[in-house]
Amino acid sequence: YAQPWKKPAHPGNPADDDAVELPAVATKTPIMWGFQAAGAAPIVAGHPITEPETVATAIRIGNPASWEKAEAARDESGGVIEAVTDEEILAAHRWLSSKEGVFVEPASASGVAGLIKKHSAGAAPAGKTWVITVTGHGLKDPDWAINNPALQNENGEGAQPTQVPQDVETVARALGL
C-alpha cells in the first residue's frame, strides 16, 4: 500500500502550504482513511445529501467543499472513505472520554469510531501505527454534552456544568485542588 512520499498536488488549507515546503522526512505515503457520519455521508453515497443528519454537527455537511481533495487523498494513498453510525460515534466518544481522558466533540470521535469498526472487521492490521486527528474539543459543542441522552445520569438528567467565579483560587477549590 505505501508509496514513496511526494508533495501533494492539493496542499489543503493555506496553512498547509508551509508544511509541504519543509524537507520531506517521511519515506512512505500514509494510507488515508476517512469516515463520514452515516446520516451525512455524501462521498460514501456518491452524491450530495440534501438533508444531512447526525449528532456530529461539525461534519453534518451534505456537499463538502473539499470533496475532490478528499477523494484524491483516498485514491492517491490507497485508502478508504466509509460511513460510521451515530451509535458508533457515541461509543467512540465514550471510549475516548473514559479510557483516554480525551473530551472531544462528536465529529472528532468519528475517526476513532472508524478505526474501531475496521479493527472489528479484521481490516486494521496489528503492528501498524495509526494516527487519528481529534482536534475538536468537547467544549466546542457543550449543548451536545449536556443534553445527550447517552451521557445522562440514572435520573435522566444531563450533565450540568459547575459554575464558579473566574478566579484561580475558586476554580482550584471547585476542582478539588
Model regions and ranges:
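Claisen-condensing/thiolase-fold acyl-transfer catalytic domains that form or cleave C-C bonds
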Residues: I89, H93-D141
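Active-site/ligand-binding loops adjacent to catalytic centers
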Residues: A2-V104, N147-L177
